[in-house]
Amino acid sequence: MAELGQQTVDFSALVGRAAEESFLSFKELVDKSKSTELSDTEKKVSLLKYVAKTQQRMLRLNALAKWCKQVPLINYFQDLGSTLSAHDICFTQAADSLFFMHEGLQQARAPVYDVPSAVEILLTGSYQRLPKCLDDVGMQSSLDEHQQKPALRKLEVLVRSKLLEITLPKEITEVKISKGTVTLSVDGEFKVLVTLGYRGHLSMWRILHLDLLVGERSGPIKLEVTRRHILGDDLERRMSVAENPFTILYAVLHELCVAIVMDTVIRQVRALLQGRWKDAIRFDLISDTGTTPANQEGEADSVSLRTPGMKLFYWSDSDKNSGPFIKIEPGSDLQIKCSHSTFVIDPLTGKEAEFSLDQSCIDVEKLLLKAICCNRYTRLLEIQKELLRNTRICRTPSDVILQALLDEPGIEGDNMVDSKERVEPEVLRVRAYGSSFFTLGINIRTGRFLLQSSKSILTSSILEEFEDALNQGSISAVDAFINLRSKSILHFFAAIGKFLGLEVYEHGFGINKVPKSLLDGSSILTLGFPDCESSHLLLMELEKDFTPLFKLLETQMDGSGKPQSFNDPSNILRAKKIDIGQIRILEDDLNLITSDVVKFVSSFSDAEGINQASGHRQPGLVDEALTEMSGSQLSFSSVVDGVFGLQKVTSALMSIDGHGLVPKNLSAVTGHGKAPMLTSYHSDSLYNRQGPLQSSSYNMLSSPPGKGSAMKKIAISNSDQELSLILSPSLSTGNGVSESGSRLVTESSLSPLPLSQTADLATSSAGPLLRKDQKPRKRSASDLLRLIPSLQVVEGVASPNKRRKTSELVQSELVKSWSPASQTLSTAVSTSTKTIGCSYGNLIAEANKGNAPSSVFVYALLHVVRHSSLSIKHAKLTSQMEALDIQYVEEMGLRDAFSDIWFRLPFAQNDSWQHICLQLGRPGSMCWDVKINDQHFRDLWELQKGSKTTPWGSGVHIANSSDVDSHIRYDPEGVVLSYQSVEADSIKKLVADIQRLSNARMFSLGMRKLLGIKPDEKTEECSANSTMKGSTGGKGSGEPVDRWRAFKIEAVGLTSLWFSFGSGVLARFVVEWESGKDGCTMHVSPDQLWPHTKFLEDFINGAEVESLLDCIRLTAGPLHALAAATRPARASTATGMPVVPATASSRQSNQIQQTQGIIAPSTLAAPNATGQSASATSGNTVASSAPSPLGGGFHGVAMLAAAGRSGPGIVPSSLLPIDVSVVLRGPYWIRIIYRKRFAVDMRCFAGDQVWLQPATPPKGGASIGGSLPCPQFRPFIMEHVAQELNGLEPNLTGSQGATNPNSGNPTVNGVNRVNFSPSSARAAMNRVASVASGSLVVSSGLPVRRTPGTAVPAHVRGELNTAIIGLGDDGGYGGGWVPLVALKKVLRGILKYLGVLWLFAQLPDLLREILGSILKDNEGALLNLDQEQPALRFFVGGYVFAVSVHRVQLLLQVLSVRRFHHQAQQNGSSAAAQEELTQSEIGEICDYFSRRVASEPYDASRVASFITLLTLPISVLREFLKLIAWKKGLSQSQQAGEIAPAQRPRIELCLENHSGTDLDNNCAAKSNIHYDRPHNTVDFALTVVLDPVHIPHINAAGGAAWLPYCVSVRLRYTFGENPSVTFLGMEGSHGGRACWQRVDDWEKCKQRVSRTVEVNGSAAGDLTQGKLKLVADSVQRTLHLCLQGLREGGNNNNNTHQKEFTI
């Protein structure tokens, strides 16, 4: 059975048997299926069984086939198992044998003694029977020094004789014999030290030492000691039996070295794969049978007995299948050979590259880098040869340079492998332009082309696009570099355009829209000029030699102002070629390299080349990107001024041109009687100072024989005649468009052309025809010819058709005008335009070759821009003139640098401003000027220089101009308007500026004519050049002329006029015409006088100067009196500010004043300018912002202390800013509105009185307008007028006197209070004293005392007495006349009267709401209201309160109902008597109402708090009355001098509610005292004004620094059986903590006050003093102590802790 298991079957037979069996079964199945006995189901089942059976058989075969692959391994394991079994049996047998033998060994351990040998040794002393084998292992003594030398000589002789007998291999490079040894060396492999004497035989070689020379960069490879001994023994044995032992030695060691070298190579390649090269390389192993692919881990799939070779592939990304590779393998001669897959050239030798491997220092990466270097050089060399054969790219040898730097490839390799974008050492440099190159390299990792450029000559996206195309092979290198060169030049010009401020249209804007008829090539750049909106475009295309060609296009704009498409050629109005090959270079152009140009060009090319070209070197130039350079676009003028400055223009040329000494040449109408639609481009004005310009349309005319050198060559334009007149578009009668070319001026080119040649000039037209929809107009040319001053000599122009005669006449006049001055001009021009003999086209060609710097392109484009600037300016300005229907003519000439346009504005009247000249300015700049010759502005020019002989006199100065009008300046001949650019509405702005100048001129002359010049100031008489529309039927027309003597002109400017009114400068006015406004703007100082100046401005805009002055004269006095009346009656003393003269030259920066030249209120302050902040100056009611509950709670107290009022804690008796607002309803109609409820109309008339009357409400009632009724208004004002006129002043405090109108030294009292100097005060008093003389009467705002002898005229007093006697009821809307001398006092009384009426109007609603919310109907209510008195009555409990208006105050009367019941009072108890107020308490209530509640400024919250007090029970009310009486007594004692007012804090009951509620929002919440009747509590507040003596020094910034420091203590009084006072809170002013800067100190003070209130509020004290009084006194003392401690603690600098004070 065992034998059956060991039998084998051939696997092929098994497979065959299985296949045969399967086939037979399938055949049998088919046969059965053909029979009809079986059903379909049975057939399917049979087929399924067959499939399953066959599947199982095949699966077994598959498993068996996989198992067969393991048969060699199984056999090997079976052999190992058999061997191990045999070893096991042997070990078992040996163990058994040792077990059975150990007993016998015990018996054999006794020694057997060799007696004979011992006897021999003892007897003879020697042992002859010693075995020979012991001789080899015995110890032998070494030879001494004397024995060694002979032995070595003998051995060396033997070695040499032995070497002569054998043949050494030729591979052995060194054989050295020394001291009996032979050293054999093979370079790069091994080194062996041998000698004779192997195993004692001198005929055989013995190896003493063995070293391997194979190594890496880290050093040679070292063998282990054991391996070296084993290898040496093996070699010795082989050499002992070999015929040629050294052949065997070399063969073995060489094979070993080859194996080590290949292993080292493979190991290094694996390291490169795992290192930085990664997927950039791969390798395959080469065996005997062929190439064996190896996995990237380096493990071979098969084992070969021979050392395999290797293929190292690189640039695998470029070609995955068959990339270039290096083959490293042992050759047939067993030598390591290295070869490259393709032919490559060594850049060092220029021959085919040879590759070898240095076995002593194996470096595969170095070999790889050399191969890559040679391969790159070979590929770039092929591209270089292609480029050198192309003449467009290579014009000079330096255009295409192959750069190869491979001295030490290993050093470069460390940095090159990791850098993907770095330019490699082997690069191909192709010139782009100038010193800028394209660099073509090859990536060291991928083999892909790397395309780079010098700095920023092209964008990275374009370079990447061409780089991908080169790598894909879709484009040849020649085409790529031609396109790159074109794009780089276009990109450079685009960058120059951005640098110059031009607009660059990206990505083929021009290619898509410019018709093909305008283009000759595909490389095109479209540049747009700033502010042109693409209406003018500059096209640039490159020729085959990369020379730029420029074309200037003018496009037709659509209705929306946008350019139309270029696809339709009819939309292109004009196309002009600019040939830079004809632009000559000036001798100093290339030396004018500015720092901006150097910095810009350095960002595109080498800075050294630019510096060398410019003659100097600037190290450290900043390289900026193109986006940075184009971020801040420069304008034309800034760049052109910096590069092409005007310093070359001689002074003679400027003087001749500036004063018009040389007449200008004129252009005539075209030959067929048709004027062009748009003025053609004129290139003669572009290079008049910098150099000549010549275009392709030149006709060169040489001087005729006999004329000599006087007649030089002169360029003739392609127009009909040399001298042609170009009319405005409105004069066009046809559709022809002419284009004038350029004129070449050389040296003496200004010599006149003979008349015989002017008629033979050729004509041509390069522009399209006039649009058909343009409607021509006919007008006589003589009308427009007269607009030009230089054509005034031309007479007799019959019609436009006689142009030849006109031109001949004009030319004859010009020829006559040629004089020696013109020759001087010729010399100057020729000197300044000296050329160097070459053009910019030649220079650009040299720059393309690298012989000129790149800055040449900048100057070339600059000259083209200069060439186009005048044409663009001319076309844009004239088109705007045409749109505005402005007639103009143009004047041009050979000798003039600029072309001038003369025009007349439509609004020009009569012969004013006939000569308005528009100068286009210098080429290259968008600046243009307009000059107006006018005598008025010439006078201002003289006045500006300080001349006192002008018609304005010596007292008038020049007014400063605003920054907006900085473009307008004076000129000796008039005025000049300068503009920096041409915008879409430039002409419209120009017309607006001229209109403003005209209006200002007309107004100034009208004022000067009306006011005249003072006798002491007028130095010469002059007549005005303009007529003013007088005010016919105006007010005061019948008054004498000297009524204007109070007016005085102080300053005059281009668009402004300053004048003052009043002998003491009552008011100053600045009238100016601001830019962007239709009419004028008036500024008044002081600005409180006129709420607005609309009516005054309307007078000026309507040219009604007399009405303006009349309005000012009649309304200034009443408005001044009103401003004085609205000031506080007792203002605090302040230091006066001197009045600055109106001639101050400093410019004000006030935001209210929009322009320069406005006199600020602080500068031109009138006598009454200070302290008028209480009056509202706007036309509408001023709404004040709601103050905060904390900060606003002490504002009234601060105002009180600042104003010096008595009664601390209350609002001062003055008007608030929200009380009064003034509105002008007409020029002479002033409405005074008091708190939106009452309004008084003041109408000004000629004479010395005004009409005052309450404003009558409209039909809808006073709620929508007008005023509430003012009862007894007319008697009130009449009474005040009578008192003032009769010298009765009962209500004024202080001693007041009157001034004698005839006295020359008036007495002034209290001047400092109103803040003006004594001189101005005297002037004000003089104005007051001028009443009797019939002149202007204005109150100065001061109380005036009249002497007893002074009396008002009797008829005036009689009229007033009659008026007072005849007064009756007028419904509250009656008015009366008020003289100006009494107006201020009457207005002040009226405002107080209106305040009382307003406060009375608040009472009914307050009574209804407060009494209704606290009391029942039978406990308190409003009884009756009488609006006519006015008066009202209300009752609270058993008392009736009557409030009535008496003059300017509210009076309160209290009537006790219980006093009429005497019996009840007698029978009543004492308790009932205590519940009734005594007469003194009633008097205290009435006095408190008059003194504190109904006082100024009137506040409804005080009335609401007072009414709330009246609703309290009698006992509680008596507590508050004791507090009020104690406070009143304390104030009286302080006023009497018992205690200084500043010695202790002042405390009072606070009635004001500063919660920010609106005045018109009547509600019970206005009360600051809150009565909770169900709980028997009253919440109230005490205001404490701190003692300023004890307040520490605090640097209080802001507007609250002058306010006193206050503290508000909020308390709650609970009355009943156990009355008590509790502390609710405490707040301080100035941010919430008053003068306590530290939060801890403030909290401590608050706690102390709280404890004080708690102690004193609950303690039972003297009831007769009152609990509230005791609490208030304690709070006052506590705060006083806290303040003293705060001051003492702040003064002690050394003490860090503040002292604590206790009560």
From Swiss-Prot:
Tissue specificity comment: Expressed in roots, stems, developing embryos, young leaf primordia, shoot apical meristems, inflorescence meristems, tapetum in anthers, ovules and floral organ primordia, but not in mature organs.
Organism superkingdom: Eukaryota
One matching Pfam family: Med14
A GO MF label: sequence-specific DNA binding
GO biological process: abscisic acid-activated signaling pathway; cold acclimation; positive regulation of cell population proliferation; positive regulation of thermomorphogenesis; positive regulation of transcription by RNA polymerase II; regulation of plant organ morphogenesis; regulation of transcription by RNA polymerase II; response to temperature stimulus
Protein keywords: Activator, Developmental protein, DNA-binding, Growth regulation, Nucleus, Stress response, Transcription, Transcription regulation
Cited InterPro entries: Med14_N, Mediator_Med14
Region spans: Disordered: 755-781
Compositional bias (Polar residues): 755-766
Induction context: Induced by PTAC12/HMR/PAP5.
Location, primary (coarse class): nucleus
Compartments where located: Nucleus
Gene deletion effect: Dwarf plants with disorganized shoot apical meristem, stem fasciation, abnormal floral structure, delayed flowering and sterile flowers. Reduced cell numbers in aerial organs. Altered sensitivity to warm temperature (e.g. 27 degrees Celsius) leading to lower thermomorphogenetic hypocotyl growth and defects in the induction of thermoresponsive growth-relevant genes (e.g. mainly involved in biosynthesis and signaling of the phytohormone auxin) as well as low levels of PTAC12/HMR/PAP5 and PIF4.
GO cellular component, one term: mediator complex
Keyword Iron applies: no
Subunit text: Component of the Mediator complex. Interacts with CDKE-1, HDA19 and LUG. Interacts with PTAC12/HMR/PAP5 and PIF4.
Protein purpose: Component of the Mediator complex, a coactivator involved in the regulated transcription of nearly all RNA polymerase II-dependent genes. Mediator functions as a bridge to convey information from gene-specific regulatory proteins to the basal RNA polymerase II transcription machinery. The Mediator complex, having a compact conformation in its free form, is recruited to promoters by direct interactions with regulatory proteins and serves for the assembly of a functional pre-initiation complex with RNA polymerase II and the general transcription factors.
Family: Belongs to the Mediator complex subunit 14 family.
PANTHER family membership: MEDIATOR COMPLEX SUBUNIT, MEDIATOR OF RNA POLYMERASE II TRANSCRIPTION SUBUNIT 14
Protein name per Swiss-Prot or TrEMBL: Mediator of RNA polymerase II transcription subunit 14
Species this chain originates from: Arabidopsis thaliana
High-level lineage: Eukaryota, Viridiplantae, Streptophyta, Embryophyta, Tracheophyta
